[in-house]
Structures are given as C-alpha cells and as structure tokens.
Amino acid sequence: MSISAQNPDISGDRQSGQDVRTQNVMACQAVSNIVKTSLGPVGLDKMLVDDIGDVTITNDGATILRMLEVEHPAAKVLVELAELQDREVGDGTTSVVIVAAELLKRANDLVRNKIHPTSIISGYRLAMRESCKYIEEKLVTKVEKLGKVPLINCAKTSMSSKLISGDSDFFANLVVEAVLSVKMTNQRGEIKYPIKGINILKAHGQSARDSYLLNGYALNTGRAAQGMPLRVSPAKIACLDFNLQKTKMQLGVQVVVNDPRELEKIRQREADMTKERIEKLLKAGANVILTTKGIDDMALKYFVEAGAIAVRRVRKEDMRHVAKATGATLVTTFADMEGEETFDPAHLGSADEVVEERIADDDVILIKGTKTSSAVSLILRGANDYMLDEMERALHDALCIVKRTLESNTVVAGGGAVESALSVYLEHLATTLGSREQLAIAEFADALLIIPKVLAVNAAKDATELVAKLRAYHHTAQTKADKKHYSSMGLDLVNGTIRNNLEAGVIEPAMSKVKIIQFATEAAITILRIDDMIKLVKDESQGEE
C-alpha cells in the first residue's frame, strides 16, 4: 500500500511504504550503474566536466562519485560510502558501491514478496558476520615477513584497472619502495607506515616511465630570492604561519601626529618590528625559514645577508608534513601570553640538508635526512595534467593498499575468488537455517556474485558461463577436502578462463574485502530501514515575519 498525500499537519510532501523504498533503490541503482563499467582491469574510464569546464578523466570510483552532484538523499549515502572506503582502505571504492546497490535491489524484491524488512536486515547482518569470519578463517593467506613479491603483486592488482596498468611492474616497485622507506615504530612498539609522509609531485614532460623516487620531502616552490644559498647543511627549519612583511596598522586606527618627524618614526617602527622578528628567528639558529604567507623584499634582504634559505607561500598541508617529519612546531604567532614577542629554539625542526634542485622547468626545495620520520617524494612525469592527475590517484590507491597489506599481513586472491567462495558458502549456510532469514542470506549470497559478473562483462567475456564455472570450482573446494586449493580460483580476464589467482599474483589485502562487505551491508541496511520520506517545504508565512 502506498500513500502520497498532503498531511494537514506537515508542511511538505510525504511519501511512504513501498513507493519510497523503490525510489531509493532506483536512485542507488543509477549511481551504481555509473561506476559499474569502470570496475576491473579492463574497466573503462569516465570523463567528468564540472560547471566551470574543468575536465577530469578517471577510473577511480571515489573520484567519480565525489564529482557527481547527487541530489537524491539515498544516493548520497552511496557517495559517502565510497568516500569512507577511500579513507579507510584506499581502494575498492567501486566494488563497495556496486555490492551495496545490488544488496538493496535484492532486498527490495524480498519486501515486495511480503518479507518484512526487519527479517531481511537481521539476515543480512548474520550473512555479513559469517562472511567476515569465513574470509578470516578459510580464505586468507598469511604473508609471513612479507617479502617484496606479494607487496608488488598487491600494488599491481590495485593499479590493474588504472591508466598506468601497462607500466604496473615499474610503478609497483616505486610504490613498494616508497612505503617501505617511511617505515617507523611508534611509542607502543607498533610498526607503522605513515604514507602521508610520501609527497607526490607532478611535473610535465617525458614519459610515465621517467617517474622516480626522491629521498627527501619536495616542496613545489623555489627560494624566495636569488641571492640565497642553494644548499644549507645541517638545516634548522622554522615553520611559520604568518606574514613576514612590514606591519601596517589596522584599518580604523587613527594616529594624531603634531610633528612630521613623528610620521617617519612610525614608518621606521613598522619596518623595525619585522626586522626584530627576523633577528629573533636567526638568533634562535634558524637557517631555513618556511612560511605559508608572504615575505617582502625588505625582509628577504636580511635572510640573504644571513645566508639563510627562505621559502614563501608553502602549502599548509606540505607545511604540516614537513613539521611532522623534521620535529618542528608550526608557529602561528611570536606573541606569548604576556604579549611579548619571543621565539623558542625548541620550535625548530632539523634535517641533514635543504637544497634547491631543478625538476623539469620548476625549482623545487628538497628537505633531506629529516629527523623524526623519513620522508620521500614521488616525482611523476607525464604528457599532460589529466594523465598526471590520474597517475596520482592510481598511486594513492596503490600506496594505501601496500600499507594495509603490510599492517594486516594477510592477503586473499583477487578476480572474484573471494566473492564466489562466499556465495557458495552462504548458500549452503542458508539451507541450514529454518527461519525467515534463510531467504535474506540466499539473496546476500547471490548479490556477492555481482562482482565476478561485472568483471566478466567489462572484459567482454561470457559472464554467465564464467561465473558458473567459478562457482563449480568453489563448490568442489568446499566439499572435497583434497581440493581445498581451489578456493583461490578466480577469473583470468585477459584469456577469459578460470585460474588460481594466488599463484598468478592477483592478490589483495584481506582487510579490503572484509571492509567492502561490512560497509556495503551497513549502507544497504541504512537505506532499507527507510519507509517514509517527508520533503519539507519552506513555510512562507515565517519568511515574511
């Protein structure tokens, strides 16, 4: 039964019952259909043009959805879901949206057949818990003391669907080296890989294979003046977040002067205030000064005389990373509690050397040998902006995946292997339950097959046949003890056959799969619980008051 009526107490439209659910499911299907064709190693790219005409060409689910201006509230849930997956895992954003939309579609069919949403939700929750347990107990492969090979394979799998898949060997090595070089142990003795310390710089020219890894944090700006030294070693770095310019009096300040000479004194004092600040900096031992704001010519003169490097207009984000890597404190003002201006030498960070180098046509400041945590930079080369942006997105995903693999130490086979195994397992599980949840779990099992199906369709292969074969292998693996190794059988999309993906090196971190299932189920449940939608209309009478 569906009602769509004006309720006298509500200033707005109200829709409830099946109508709303169908509408929500349709909206989610529409979002999922947009990213569906970009899944997998042979997925296609999307060209997005925003309102000012900027073009983005990408294959990354999170980027596509972020740039779509989605109006529908239920579809927005999926967009946020992709962003969450991007933050938590870094890859698998497309999969998570497709799975969530498929779960919703199937749940909606069940509701139409008079199964109550609450039964479906509890069935989905049970299926999710069982899936995660099954992955962790039966499907994962421990990668003891990870050598480089599994890491490189994980990075290659992540890149396989991106623009740089042709050079995935080359880039996978770059990524793994970059992640391993920022390895650190925190106070609790845990080994962490802060990939925020990996700076990605994009420079036009040459080919993608001319990209390289630089030891040191690269800032995309040059020295503020030519007279400054090209190299400072050892470096004491001050990170500032304010102007080093002549302090002008604020607007509205009135100064009454009787003597014209007083005017000159005021001007002189304005200049001296900046000079004193610079002297305090240099006295504290700073020989590299980075600021997010500007430095005027008068201030530069003092730095040149002192033989220090000053860099202005550094990005705030870069500044935070440099401060973290060198042990510096980002200083926003010199004034202390009493209003006195001081600069504590403890705020300085230290590095072995700071040099200016030329990369492509741009001057770049490199901070090498940082004190607290090591920092590296990936210098990407490429033909144009679109290509460089897409390379950066691909490398971001790969860096996240390698980090997750190192931290969790477990991998699973890719190419639809996990989804098929879970599907077969959950179908069997559903038949052992005598409750209503049985139907929901069977639908959950079917919904997971959407991943191998879409992979096969995108590769222009016969999806029905391939998925049937794949399920047969996994059924054998789960019923016959001597055929356990079949559980890592997945799709080989180049040849359109089934192969053992663990041996073929198509692997992903286990946590990526677990998170996809958890997030997709939670999102589907959130949307499934909605059975009433009230769109409020702005009350005119209040506006007039």
UniProtKB/Swiss-Prot annotation:
Q: What is its main location?
A: cytoplasm
Task: Quote the function comment for this protein.
Answer: Molecular chaperone; assists the folding of proteins upon ATP hydrolysis. Known to play a role, in vitro, in the folding of actin and tubulin.
Annotated protein name in UniProt:
T-complex protein 1 subunit alpha
Quaternary structure, per UniProt, is: Heterooligomeric complex of about 850 to 900 kDa that forms two stacked rings, 12 to 16 nm in diameter.
One Pfam family hit: Cpn60_TCP1
The UniProt entry's GO CC annotations, sorted and at most eight, read: cytosol
Task: Give the classification, highest ranks.
Answer: Eukaryota, Viridiplantae, Streptophyta, Embryophyta, Tracheophyta
Give the sites modified to N-acetylserine.
S2
- Provide this UniProt record's keywords sorted from A to Z: Acetylation, ATP-binding, Chaperone, Cytoplasm, Nucleotide-binding
Family assignment from sequence similarity:
Belongs to the TCP-1 chaperonin family.
Q: Does the keyword Chaperone apply?
A: yes
Subcellular localization is given as: Cytoplasm
For molecular function, the Gene Ontology terms on record are:
ATP binding; ATP hydrolysis activity; ATP-dependent protein folding chaperone; unfolded protein binding
- Known InterPro entries for this protein? Chap_CCT_alpha (IPR012715), Chaperone_TCP-1 (IPR017998), Chaperonin_TCP-1_CS (IPR002194), Cpn60/GroEL/TCP-1 (IPR002423), GroEL-like_apical_dom_sf (IPR027409), GROEL-like_equatorial_sf (IPR027413), TCP-1-like_intermed_sf (IPR027410), TCP-1_chaperonin (IPR053374)
Matches recorded under Gene3D superfamilies? GroEL, GroEL-like equatorial domain, TCP-1-like chaperonin intermediate domain
Q: Which PANTHER family match?
A: CHAPERONIN
